[in-house]
């Protein structure tokens, strides 16, 4: 079985930010020619939205994936909007149940916002940060969610 959680974990260790790592674990949801664009679009959500420490980037990455499945592009399509927002809230509740919050600063035990300067990815960084594990958990929760919603098969692959 595919393990998208492990994929997200490994992408984070390769240097992608938390949001990008989750999106990369679901890269097959996007056209291959658009991957650079998707990575650019997901990049501001790392660090709880540009290190503002708001919504966890792994949750935002999952929301981007959910948007690729349930999103809408017609103004005023209230039915599709309702479905998307409902799926987002369901996912957020699952993540929060597992982790206690969807807010970056809460998950990291920080107070307030951070500087815009990203920290260097050293061994000490990975020891003190739950971010790789949160990438794994978010992508795994999303995988189970998408299986339960009939989007992925039991092997974790997109249903044809």
Predicted regions and their residues:
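Short cysteine clusters
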Residues: 18, 56, 104
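Conserved phosphate/anionic-ligand binding catalytic regions in large, soluble enzymes, centered on
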Residues: 52-64
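Polybasic, low-complexity association/targeting segments
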Residues: 1-15
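Phosphate-handling active-site elements
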Residues: 29-38, 66-87
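C-terminal binding/interaction regions
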Residues: 85-160
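Transmembrane alpha-helix interface/packing and boundary motifs in multi-pass membrane proteins
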Residues: 44-52
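Acidic-glycine-rich active-site phosphate/pyrophosphate-binding loop
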Residues: 26-44, 110-115
